[in-house]
């Protein structure tokens, strides 16, 4: 594989970092943390509208989408670079869900009307999301939500959990089982029951109840398994890339603290126990970086990437746990201050650790692939 970043990767990463650096400050994060929304969560937790608008205006949102939907026809490597920067700044925007998964899937598999929706998402005028998780279902490729074809079109019945930005979404991508096979549908959240869920880092996630809910098929039923695999693969990789950025910045923060904080007349970073924990955290971050880079490169080259993607998500969860706790422990009492920026990075890392499956889930999936 080639570890050399593309020029587009560097440019988009730099541009995303500049936009976030101007708009995502510690005060802004605190403001988002303290925001309170309406009864349905319509104007609530952790959505940074000014940042989303700026990312759209600078072309970041559409850059890695196909030209057919208004993008620059870049790809996975460039999307990974953007997600890494967004994770580094704890950006409260749905780039992964609306652009990578929503617009990306519709651009690739959708009909003309659905591709138009992808174009609007790339321009930032609408938000899309995907409902990939279900309670007590550890196999996202085999959803328990069911789809039935009627004279009036498709109808879905089931329940999805932790659906990001469902309250703001124009449409939700919903995988469901239809006649024993998997298919992917578009659902208008106005026709479903959308309920806010309490999340530690105040990410805007919602339960979505479907009861004979009208839906629109994406692609074909026969191609549904391929479409869902495409979505899940990029969801796992995107989450891992975001976690990489979060852990990189968290490690920078704790390294700065260890250099500046003195105890017994010495910087705490000079003590062997602290230095060893920071060294282990550095190794974890580098391991995750290599895993994410390999998975992204394989996908960009249209090579088999399932094992690499599960490996990256395992590292995102396992290394994320260790690094997040190291950052808090080394900061001492400051680390448990909920008003300190370290708390934001800790909760973000813990959220990324378990989102879309934890380390055990992805080890099981990886083991099944290796056993074939």
Where are these regions (language model features)?
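C-terminal helix-coil-helix/basic helical segment that borders enzyme active sites and/or dimer interfaces
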Residues: 24-42, 255, 259-266, 282-315, ...
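Glycine-rich phosphate/cofactor-binding loops in nucleotide/flavin-utilizing enzymes
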Residues: 2, 13, 333-372
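Glycine-rich beta->alpha junctions and the first turn(s) of the following alpha-helix
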Residues: 2-8, 12, 88, 192-286
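A short, Trp-centered hydrophobic/proline-enriched beta-strand micro-motif
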Residues: 124-135
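N-terminal glycine-rich flavin-associated loop
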Residues: 91-112
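A short core secondary-structure module
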Residues: 131, 157-192, 196-197
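Amphipathic, small/basic residue-rich leader segments at the start of a protein or domain
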Residues: 1-93, 368-372
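A structural signal for short hydrophobic beta-strand segments in well-ordered beta-sheet cores
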Residues: 145-148
């Amino acid at each position: 594989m080639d570890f050399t970043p593309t020029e587009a990767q560097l440019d988009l990463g730099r541009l995303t970092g500049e936009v976030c650096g101007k708009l995502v400050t510690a005060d802004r994060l605190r403001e988002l943390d303290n925001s309170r929304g309406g009864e349905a969560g319509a104007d609530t937790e952790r959505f940074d509208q000014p940042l989303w608008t700026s990312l759209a205006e600078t072309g970041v949102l559409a850059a890695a989408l196909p030209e057919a939907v208004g993008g620059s026809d870049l790809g996975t490597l460039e999307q990974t670079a953007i997600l890494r920067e967004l994770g580094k700044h704890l950006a409260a925007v749905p780039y992964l869900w609306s652009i990578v998964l929503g617009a990306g899937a519709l651009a690739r598999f959708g009909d003309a009307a659905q591709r138009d929706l992808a174009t609007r998402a790339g321009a930032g005028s609408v938000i899309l999301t995907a409902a990939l998780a279900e309670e007590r279902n550890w196999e996202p490729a085999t959803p328990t939500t069911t789809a039935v074809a009627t004279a009036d079109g498709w109808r879905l019945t089931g329940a999805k959990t932790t659906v990001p930005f469902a309250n703001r979404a124009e449409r939700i991508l919903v995988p469901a089982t239809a006649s024993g096979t998997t298919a992917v549908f578009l659902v208008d959240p106005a026709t479903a029951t959308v309920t806010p869920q309490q999340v530690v880092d105040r990410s805007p996630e919602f339960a979505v109840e479907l009861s004979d809910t009208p839906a629109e098929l994406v692609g074909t039923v026969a191609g549904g398994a391929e479409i869902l695999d495409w979505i899940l693969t990029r969801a796992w990789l995107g989450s891992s890339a975001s976690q990489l950025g979060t852990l990189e910045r968290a490690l920078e923060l704790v390294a700065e603290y260890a250099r500046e904080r003195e105890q017994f007349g010495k910087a705490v970073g000079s003590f062997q126990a602290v230095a060893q924990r920071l060294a282990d955290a550095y190794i974890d971050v580098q391991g995750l970086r290599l895993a994410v880079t390999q998975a992204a490169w394989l996908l960009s080259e249209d090579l088999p990437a399932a094992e690499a993607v599960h490996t990256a998500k395992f590292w995102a969860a396992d290394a994320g746990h260790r690094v997040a706790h190291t950052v808090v422990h080394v900061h001492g009492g400051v680390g448990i201050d909920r008003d300190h920026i370290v708390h934001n990075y800790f909760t973000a890392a813990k959220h990324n650790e378990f989102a879309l499956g934890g380390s055990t889930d992805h080890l099981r999936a990886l083991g099944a692939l290796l056993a074939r």
